[in-house]
Amino acid sequence: MADEALAGLDEGALRKLLEVTADLAERRRIRSAIRELQRQELEREEEALASKRFRAERQDNKENWLHSQQREAEQRAALARLAGQLESMNDVEELTALLRSAGEYEERKLIRAAIRRVRAQEIEAATLAGRLYSGRPNSGSREDSKGLAAHRLEQCEVPEREEQEQQAEVSKPTPTPEGTSQDVTTVTLLLRAPPGSTSSSPASPSSSPTPASPEPPLEPAEAQCLTAEVPGSPEPPPSPPKTTSPEPQESPTLPSTEGQVVNKLLSGPKETPAAQSPTRGPSDTKRADVAGPRPCQRSLSVLSPRQPAQNRESTPLASGPSSFQRAGSVRDRVHKFTSDSPMAARLQDGTPQAALSPLTPARLLGPSLTSTTPASSSSGSSSRGPSDTSSRFSKEQRGVAQPLAQLRSCPQEEGPRGRGLAARPLENRAGGPVARSEEPGAPLPVAVGTAEPGGSMKTTFTIEIKDGRGQASTGRVLLPTGNQRAELTLGLRAPPTLLSTSSGGKSTITRVNSPGTLARLGSVTHVTSFSHAPPSSRGGCSIKMEAEPAEPLAAAVEAANGAEQTRVNKAPEGRSPLSAEELMTIEDEGVLDKMLDQSTDFEERKLIRAALRELRQRKRDQRDKERERRLQEARGRPGEGRGNTATETTTRHSQRAADGSAVSTVTKTERLVHSNDGTRTARTTTVESSFVRRSENGSGSTMMQTKTFSSSSSSKKMGSIFDREDQASPRAGSLAALEKRQAEKKKELMKAQSLPKTSASQARKAMIEKLEKEGAAGSPGGPRAAVQRSTSFGVPNANSIKQMLLDWCRAKTRGYEHVDIQNFSSSWSDGMAFCALVHNFFPEAFDYGQLSPQNRRQNFEVAFSSAEMLVDCVPLVEVDDMMIMGKKPDPKCVFTYVQSLYNHLRRHELRLRGKNV
């Protein structure tokens, strides 16, 4: 029945009942009921969280269920009306504003769906407009497109036939079956040429060719290459010059399937770039262009399938003074696509432009898609499907005065695995020096930059690694300066050993390990190579680039290296281990305490603690011997101390054997001591027995035994340690007083042990206070008989004294705001506890309500100055020191000052009591 009554109560009522209940069995039942209530509450919360789209009001509205049903019906009707309104809305900005103002999840879901629908319609319209604007016939058959592609690829062949054949063998595709997990690497280079570039420009944008390997036919809808002629030419030329014509080379439009795509377009020297808007579905890649006045749009796309693992070979790449060997890396693929293809793009604008040179081929690790498209600075939009990647670039750089290169990360979603890889655009400043390819003597594959002050250039790299394994991604940025080579690792696992090569000068690498770090480089003028380590080595996709000196980082690197070396050198240096013999020679506990605080080694701390125990034991033994000596001296002194009346009775009983061979003597001495005020009585009984036996030859043996019994009684009131007053008159340190105190200690200790815990602590505190008072009292004429502390009588250690002081401070500051005294460190950090302590004794000294925990300095100054002025308590800790120590001041400093404050305030309190009496 009692359990049922408890089950009907809430947790607050049960806790109040627990506070007033003393029966252990009843308290156990109440605690069980509280635990059951908490368990039920947790279960309800777990069920609510497990339910989809949890709403708290639906759970709490159980009493008005009908109204809740009506409200849900109204919400459904409102959603239906909203869906009808959204069908007629085609403005993305209006829908976005509506989305921001919507508060319900279902409404926001409908608005997001409408925004996706409108964007899809815009993309379709832009794609159609781009097709119509390009003037390219869309009704051409697959065979016509195939022939056109072959014809244009044949026009762009380079003289190096050996490298062409070798590259064609390397890049020969291997079909990958659908439905299997494969790695897809996407490298997108967006180059925007200045509109008014002339023949005086040192370099102009040129895109890299692709390998002329046999390609299977692909669907035209999946790979479109839209181009426009230079202003003034309505139609693109059917057969442009091979390598020296200033007119742009047209790119073939190949049919597209799930296999490979080769679309080659080169940007002309006088073309205005157009924006590119890629849209990728879950299993294919679609390219669509945003409608608008775009004179030129060209792209380069290569998609090759993954080769079997056993066919992958490691071919070293010649890179400056050292060789960079990484089999099947993105670096190898880009070298193959840009430098080793049968087509070489050479643009001439008054002066010969940079040409592409072959490099040593390397086998591909997996399928890769490389796209090079001039990007417009005015607009760029992208739309993502369930697993697509989008990048929007609408920022342009103006002239040489623009900021340094910025690395930005854009979120993207990939595949069913859901692994996101950040696509980081790189904005470069125009006018930088021309960098060289990694092969000595080779012309640069991509050269960008202008010499005009008003010119602008934008290069964007989008690197996408699609992996079926769904591995976690990490990033690392390596930023050198000067002639050094910067290496940027995007979103992949770092290799165990990262190799870096430089074309000349010193090589200094600063490693920044945070993946999301924004790094600023110098004016990057040339992308030298790409590098991707195979999955077996968990390598990263690296972009290497030449950079102008932006700021001297070498000093910082050297400083960091020096600091590291300093730490390494300092590590072996340590203090010699302490020995037990050295510690035994230390006689000061304070020194050992400091050593214990400063030591961090476990063995040293163990030795120091052992030495502390030994030292304390020696001091205890010394105190015991001193006490025995004083007892003997007190026994030899005649008379009793002043203020006491003593009565002594001695009884002696002797017994002799009949033959006289043995004598037994018993002496009993009773001493009764009364204090003059009649509050204390001490009784001491001493029994001495001796047994003497004589042998026949005259020798004898004596055995003596002494027993002492002491008892005392006191009618003095026992109270709290803080309510007792000091003794005004000193007392005599006689033998009777010592014996009486010893008996009182034993009696009060037994009483404290028999009481409950709260009463035991109070009795122990009262006993300690009384012992300290009695120990301080003594005869002025003779030596003061101080009571020595001993663990046998329960005398507290330092921790208990600190706890007693904390209890006193809590009692005096109870009820003050912003005061919660739990320790001698953080509880005193804002100064409010000091102010409350002083204000409790001197309410008229200052207005406590005007103080604030935020104004720490004022609190310390008010408390310290008031205590010094009112009770002459010198501030043992400075205000500046407390401010410097912050939220966790030194406990020893705080304890020392609080102890001094306690002594002065207690004296003031006792003086007030004496005046009132």
UniProtKB/Swiss-Prot annotation:
Database matches in SMART domains: CH
GO cellular component: actin cytoskeleton; cytoplasm; cytoskeleton
Sequence positions bearing N-acetylalanine: 2
Residue numbers of Phosphothreonine PTMs: 351, 360, 373
Chief location category: cytoplasm
Annotated S-S bridges: none
Region (Disordered): 157-456, 560-580, 617-767
GO biological process: muscle organ development; smooth muscle contraction
Keywords for the protein's UniProt record, in alphabetical order: Acetylation, Coiled coil, Cytoplasm, Cytoskeleton, Phosphoprotein
Polar residues biased stretches: 177-188, 298-326, 676-689
Biased composition (Pro residues): 233-243
Location of the protein in the cell: Cytoplasm, Cytoskeleton
Coiled coil start-end: 24-89, 603-630
Domain Calponin-homology (CH): 799-906
Record keyword Zinc-finger present: no
Stored InterPro entries: CH_dom, CH_dom_sf, F-actin_Monoox_Mical, SMTN
Biased composition (Basic and acidic residues): 329-338, 617-640, 738-750
Residues where Phosphoserine is found: 299, 301, 304, 341, 357, 503, 514, 523, 576, 729, 792
Expression across tissues: Smooth muscle; contractile or vascular (for the long form).
GO function terms (MF aspect): actin binding; structural constituent of muscle
Record family assignment: Belongs to the smoothelin family.
Stated role: Structural protein of the cytoskeleton.
Name of the protein in its database record: Smoothelin
Recorded name of the encoding gene: SMTN
